Amino acid sequence: GFPCGESCVYIPCFTAAIGCSCKSKVCYKN
């Protein structure tokens, strides 16, 4: 639920390495 400061409209979340996932075109963690 916390934004990771990264969008994932055209590319995947690089922050996935620290547990972030793409939700509504923005990367979130929990």
From Swiss-Prot:
<dbReference type="InterPro" id="IPR036146">
    <property type="entry name" value="Cyclotide_sf"/>
</dbReference>
<keyword id="KW-0611">Plant defense</keyword>
<keyword id="KW-1015">Disulfide bond</keyword>
<dbReference type="Pfam" id="PF03784">
    <property type="entry name" value="Cyclotide"/>
</dbReference>
<comment type="function">
    <text>Probably participates in a plant defense mechanism. Has strong cytotoxic activity against HUVEC cells (LC(50)= 0.58 uM) and various cancer cells including HeLa (LC(50)= 0.48 uM), MCF-7 and K562. Also displays some hemolytic activity. Binds to and induces leakage in phospholipd membranes, particularly ones containing 1-palmitoyl-2-oleophosphatidylethanolamine (POPE).</text>
</comment>
<dbReference type="InterPro" id="IPR012323">
    <property type="entry name" value="Cyclotide_bracelet_CS"/>
</dbReference>
<dbReference type="GO" id="GO:0006952">
    <property type="term" value="P:defense response"/>
</dbReference>
<keyword id="KW-0960">Knottin</keyword>
<feature type="cross-link" description="Cyclopeptide (Gly-Asn)">
    <location>
        <begin position="1"/>
        <end position="30"/>
    </location>
</feature>
<dbReference type="GO" id="GO:0044179">
    <property type="term" value="P:hemolysis in another organism"/>
</dbReference>
<feature type="disulfide bond">
    <location>
        <begin position="8"/>
        <end position="22"/>
    </location>
</feature>
<comment type="similarity">
    <text>Belongs to the cyclotide family. Bracelet subfamily.</text>
</comment>
<dbReference type="GO" id="GO:0051715">
    <property type="term" value="P:cytolysis in another organism"/>
</dbReference>
<feature type="disulfide bond">
    <location>
        <begin position="13"/>
        <end position="27"/>
    </location>
</feature>
<protein>
    <recommendedName>
        <fullName>Cyclotide hyen-D</fullName>
    </recommendedName>
</protein>
<feature type="disulfide bond">
    <location>
        <begin position="4"/>
        <end position="20"/>
    </location>
</feature>
<dbReference type="InterPro" id="IPR005535">
    <property type="entry name" value="Cyclotide"/>
</dbReference>
